[in-house]
Amino acid sequence: MAKFLSQDQINEYKECFSLYDKQQRGKIKATDLLTVMRCLGASPTPGEAQRHLQTHRIDRNGELDFSTFLTIMHMQIKQEDPKKEILLAMLMADKEKKGYIMASELRSKLMQLGEKLTHKEVEDLFREAGIEPNGKVKYDEFIQKLTIPVRDY
């Protein structure tokens, strides 16, 4: 697993895993899997967490060790692709498949659907992504700007 995850990630995962390893036996309860994964920034649904457990033949009342947990986290992270999720959301809004969405329509969707953004949050997002208030937002450019890795100073 070390070839897929950095040592820093493994250390962070171990620290969080240890908080839920109440009896300090190197295991967490299967019922805690979803919580631990979310604490580490993953976004599994309850169904996804259950499928991970089933893949490893772990009963809902069972336990999993750290090695299994690392494998599960790796699989979850691999399937969570923000670029793909953003593209799918934009394609749903683009009924005519033009390859772009009007900024006004994107603003409306961001403020009304899902985890609603405020007007200021949308304005900040548009400013950072270089989107004109009444312009066209091309998917590929928008996704590229949104998913640029943040520099670690």
Swiss-Prot record:
InterPro entries xrefs: CALM/Myosin/TropC-like (IPR050230), EF-hand-dom_pair (IPR011992), EF_hand_dom (IPR002048)
Compartments (UniProt record): Cell projection, Microvillus
Pfam families the record matches: EF-hand_7
Keywords assigned by UniProt, alphabetized: Cell projection, Repeat
EF-hand domain mapped to chain residues: 8-43, 44-79, 81-116, 117-152
One CC-aspect GO term: cytoplasm
Gene Ontology BP term (one): microtubule cytoskeleton organization
Keyword Repeat: yes
A molecular-function term among this protein's GO annotations: calcium ion binding
Record family assignment: Belongs to the calmodulin family.
Job description of the protein: As part of the intermicrovillar adhesion complex/IMAC plays a role in epithelial brush border differentiation, controlling microvilli organization and length. Acts as a light chain for MYO7B and is required for efficient targeting of the IMAC to the tips of border brush microvilli.
Subunit structure: Interacts with MYO7B; the interaction mediates the association of CALML4 with the IMAC/intermicrovillar adhesion complex. Interacts with MYO7A.
Name of the protein: Calmodulin-like protein 4
Source organism of this protein record: Bos taurus
Taxonomic path: Eukaryota, Metazoa, Chordata, Craniata, Vertebrata
